[in-house]
Amino acid sequence: MENLASLLKSHKLSQADYEHIVQILGREPNLVELGVFSAMWSEHCSYKSSKKYLRGFPTEAAWVIQGPGENAGVIDIGEGYAAVFKMESHNHPSFIEPYQGAATGVGGIMRDVFTMGARPVASLNAIRFGDIRRQDEIGKKHRYLLKGVVAGIGGYGNCMGVPTVGGEMSFEDCYNGNILVNAFTLGIAKSDEIFYGRAEGIGNPVIYVGSKTGRDGLGGAVMSSDSFDDAANQLRPTVQVGDPFAEKLLLEACLELFKTNYIVGIQDMGAAGLTSSSFEMAGRSGSGMIMHLDRVPMREQGMTPYELMLSESQERMLICAKKGYEEKVLEIFRKWELDAEVIGEVTSSGKMELFWHGEKCAEIPVLPVSEEAPMLDRPTKEPAYLAEIRSKGAQAPKEIDLKEAFMKLWSAPETMDKSWVYSQYDSMVQTNTIVGPGGGDGSLVRVKENGAALAMSADCNPRYCYLNPREGAKLAVAESGRNVAVRGARPLAITDCLNFGSPENPEVMWQFAEACEGIKEACKVLLTPVVSGNVSLYNQTNGVDIFPTPSIATVGLLPKAQKALLGAFKKEGNLLLLVGETKSEFGGSLYQKEVEGFLGGDAPVIDLHRELALWRFLEEANEAGFLESAKDVNVGGLAIALGKMSVLGQKGCKVKTALKGVDLFSESPSRAVLEVSSEHLAALESLAQKGGVALGVIGSVGGENLEIDSLSLPLQTLQEIYLRGFAKIVENL
């Protein structure tokens, strides 16, 4: 190969990597082989910088059917059914081309779920942008990016007939050069009918199904394993182009196939396309494979083996069928007007042998590529910025104008209702949505098959994680689980999407290592194992890294859907109770951001055992019928939580606390507001005492104002800002 140095640079391979490849092959690689190694050894596919930290996560429990290592995680939800779910990032593509980047992110995560045999029933997203309130070019750009991402998520999800039932948004300057788009999908399957990405049985046919292969997405996995600079727009050809109608056909064809006994395994073609799907299937099974690339359905002329192996064209799957059933498999996909071709077979060689019009164009041992990518032990160093920002302190002044402070927080984009966003999503399709977007806290979806409901929520406060990555990650796990618990459900498991800056920066690797320790500790205590996930590194532009953003999505089970607990006031005269203890904790808070205009101090400190006690208390109280509504206290503190419950329930409240002024906006964790009928108060207090949970009456529901201590605001005024304010910011009105 000519000009080896430039070739290695374009493939993001080092000289040491190249020498390792030569050692594996026993010769110099050709271009196809180099491309395969480049993709599979990329950060995006191999997790070479992060795997050592991920190994510490708790992944097992009695209810876990499948943990990390497959296309998605699987948990038992009773009566012979399972929930299949995962969250993944599509950050780099969405910054380059927001509509297609976000759309194909949704399509990719849905394929990960239905390739396991599950019908997708709900989606969430966690999306983060720069400051959309700015009146400069940065603000203008991020309003454009926001519009494109939201349109892409809605455009794909709506066509698939899968409801988008919730999500999370945040806005920080650290995302000015790198937005984050994290997509989550959950599906339902029979627990004894889960399909895996395997290719076993010598002589079994390998079948390509779905859309034709084009040149879109070429080099996508490698692109997602590097930082950006001002030339990022030139990477637009590496962004995949989605066709949701083709994916809808693929979904239905796959679900029809799963009712047969024709196949051994199936794998989505995601990052690195045909390369990753074939090597992963063979690698898991300890087998080899022969593939004839000239048989791959192509939509462009003159495509080469290199392009066919590395294209990331969407809506494609690779199937290992049972020998003799080839025609039956092909018949199903052709009925759904999809391409389907036998392109190879399983072998016992342990090698991937690729042919092009009868001539061998590549021969690579499977395991060194799929399972044995060189792992990196990158240096870590505590960031220099920590000493400075922690020294700023986070103690807010006690003498404040409560009304002025409340209105600043109430008018923040993080607080306001996002109907401008979720009105573009179909949240009710499939008619199973009990609590959708706009309902506050966790979303809730009915499982008609067993009468239960599944609660889900995606959460992370990147400001906490910047101040203290370990505590911030713990708080993300706890917040996500608490949003599920206030629906009356028991949190069972999590999927994560770990978004960080460049791993080549020792300070970023320190943040990553600390966050992983926090997740590990929280999941162990809270009994929510990690069953799937994703790592997105190199979220850096022109040397500026994003805040550590370990997005956590928790799934919980409510055995009886009719016991669903909502987050809006229900009845005038009901009592309001605060569960948990409030301290003066403002590091990384919305109050600190909006009122004081800085970021400093330390993140709130969480007692994980107290958090678990809160979850179990909420579950028991709801099961006993003691609760009318419940709301997590988090961003903006108690005052904002009460404001949201008032607006959502269209009822005011009268609250008196023992808190001093600004502590109404404290973000101490492990707290919730409960609405209860007075007849249940004594029993609830007894239950709280038994569970070791702090509980106190703070007021009642009623009136047309939000009244909290000396603060009194008309509900009508709050509704106007809450319901219409976000749209005004996005449209720059």
UniProtKB/Swiss-Prot annotation:
It is found in: Cytoplasm. It holds the Pfam family AIRS. ATP binds at Y47, K86, D496, G533. The keyword Nucleotide-binding applies. Disulfide bonds: none annotated. GO terms for biological process: 'de novo' IMP biosynthetic process. The active site is at H44, H90 (proton acceptor). It comes from the Bacteria. NCBIfam families: FGAM_synth_II, PRK01213.1. This is Phosphoribosylformylglycinamidine synthase subunit PurL. It comes from Wolinella succinogenes (strain ATCC 29543 / DSM 1740 / CCUG 13145 / JCM 31913 / LMG 7466 / NCTC 11488 / FDC 602W). The gene is purL.
